[in-house]
């Protein structure tokens, strides 16, 4: 950070969207300091650019999953090359359960380039080493680095593993809950601790006093997360969460639609709503000018800004699309299907998903259509509340769901309250975690009540890549009580 080197988060799927979220929260914090402490404005703007992110499939994957892309180590390696990283830069490879080839490929490539590479994984190392070639490639880099270090050899290469095994999933069939949550906690806490250290070293006591928020130790982040889970699973918070689940179940049982609106936490909620499609085989987000595809059950809009500006507030950096040609895919040994029909994942694709405050009749096109205002710590300003009440007349109904430190004054007739008290920190990581965990529970609870969870299996997963084909095979084998090998077509897995 002192040398303004890059810190780049690389990930896929749910963790990829989480990486974009951390990137955005980091930029928001430093850009927000410019008005508070203008004497350091140039330093703050430089610091905002230190952290960056990329996800497999590019930023388009934020709104719609890109099928099969995570199956290729070459894709992840190319994204590292395009990030123009070099010695002194840091690559944080958030590999989720260690199964995604693209992130393993980015970790290997980072190591080859002499980038300081950190590899986070949430499965037992022995299992990954024994059964997965794509994971073994990363561990071979780790072995080489350890051997060279022991011999006193410094060849400029650096890689460190950070195991985050959290045990078996209570509700299985998606990595988006336990695995992505623990990665957000670990990586987000590390970012905040680094930011706080820099601030203490470079600002005066009076300057520090106006920043606001607490500076936690790593142990205190763990304690805060324990508190988050305890509060959310008991008392008023649990009752509010259950009420929100019933609200959504009732809406969808009437073939209705839910449209969330928020500004400050738009990216957090977009992440959950996007993940519902592959996790529960629901209609994905559709482009604004697409009038033939099915409308997504849930959607998200920014009440303050039109589409182009709303997207700028989501990323707080230029949109990163993948401008890859057919020749690029051939060089990366992509499947013939991808070569023949390259997916539309350019930067311009993102803007075709309208999340701004433009009128969208498709969201209230059904008899049952619900407008849901999300308020976190009183983030719903008067302007947002007024927009909600104005737009509500177009919908059949609506509700305000309020999280965190909830002001006593009501802002709507119908409110669902989920009170949780957590520390406020520089990027507000604990409240981002609250929204993530709460919405994961909301969407999973809703799908469970609608029969899309059987036992503890999310049975309607959409098997669009090797990892999900494997997962679907395990579900079939478990429920049908047959050997795993009989649960899939080996030709499909490859």
Each predicted region: which residue ranges?
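Conserved N-terminal alpha-helical segment that immediately precedes and caps sugar-phosphate-binding
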Residues: 1-494
């Amino acid at each position: 950070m002192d040398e303004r080197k890059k810190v780049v988060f690389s990930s896929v799927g749910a963790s990829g969207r989480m990486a974009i979220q951390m990137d955005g929260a980091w930029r928001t914090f430093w850009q927000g300091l410019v008005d508070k402490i203008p004497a350091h404005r140039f330093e703050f703007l430089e610091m905002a650019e230190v952290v960056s992110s990329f996800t497999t499939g590019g930023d388009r994957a934020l709104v719609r999953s890109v099928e099969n892309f995570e199956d290729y180590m070459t894709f992840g390696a190319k994204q590292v090359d395009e990030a123009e990283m070099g010695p002194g830069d840091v690559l944080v490879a958030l590999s989720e359960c260690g199964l995604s080839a693209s992130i393993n490929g980015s970790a290997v490539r980072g190591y080859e380039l002499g980038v300081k590479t950190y590899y986070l994984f949430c499965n037992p190392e022995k299992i990954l080493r024994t059964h997965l070639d794509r994971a073994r490639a990363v561990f071979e880099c780790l072995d080489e680095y350890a051997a060279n270090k022991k011999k006193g050899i410094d060849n400029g290469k650096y890689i460190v593993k950070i195991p985050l095994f959290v045990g078996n999933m209570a509700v299985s069939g998606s990595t988006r809950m336990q695995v992505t949550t623990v990665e957000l906690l670990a990586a987000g806490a590390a970012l905040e601790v680094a930011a706080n250290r820099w601030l203490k070293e470079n600002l005066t006591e009076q300057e520090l006093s106006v920043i606001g928020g607490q500076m936690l130790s790593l142990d205190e982040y763990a304690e805060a997360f324990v508190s988050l889970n305890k509060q959310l699973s008991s008392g008023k918070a649990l009752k509010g969460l259950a009420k929100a689940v019933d609200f959504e179940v009732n809406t969808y049982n009437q073939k209705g639609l839910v449209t969330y609106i928020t500004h400050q936490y738009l990216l957090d909620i977009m992440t959950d709503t996007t993940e519902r499609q592959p996790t529960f085989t629901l209609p994905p987000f559709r482009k604004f000018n697409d009038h033939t595809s099915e409308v997504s059950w849930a959607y998200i809009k920014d009440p303050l800004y039109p589409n182009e500006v709303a997207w700028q507030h989501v990323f707080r950096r230029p949109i990163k699309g993948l401008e890859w040609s057919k020749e690029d895919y051939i060089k990366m040994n992509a499947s013939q299907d991808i070569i023949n029909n390259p997916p539309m994942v350019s930067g311009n694709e993102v803007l075709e998903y309208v999340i701004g405050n433009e009128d969208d009749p498709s969201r209230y096109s059904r008899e049952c259509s619900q407008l849901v205002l999300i308020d976190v710590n009183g983030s719903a300003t008067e302007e947002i509340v007024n927009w909600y009440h104005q737009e509500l007349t177009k919908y059949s109904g609506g509700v305000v769901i309020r999280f965190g430190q909830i002001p006593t004054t009501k802002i709507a007739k119908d409110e669902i309250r989920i009170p949780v008290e957590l520390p406020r920190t520089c990027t507000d990581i604990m409240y981002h975690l609250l929204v993530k965990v709460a919405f994961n529970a909301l969407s999973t609870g809703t799908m469970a009540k609608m029969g899309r969870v059987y036992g503890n299996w999310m049975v309607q997963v959409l098997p669009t890549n090797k990892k999900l084909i494997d997962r679907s095979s395990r579900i079939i084998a478990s429920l049908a009580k047959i050997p795993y090998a009989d649960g899939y077509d080996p030709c499909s897995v490859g």
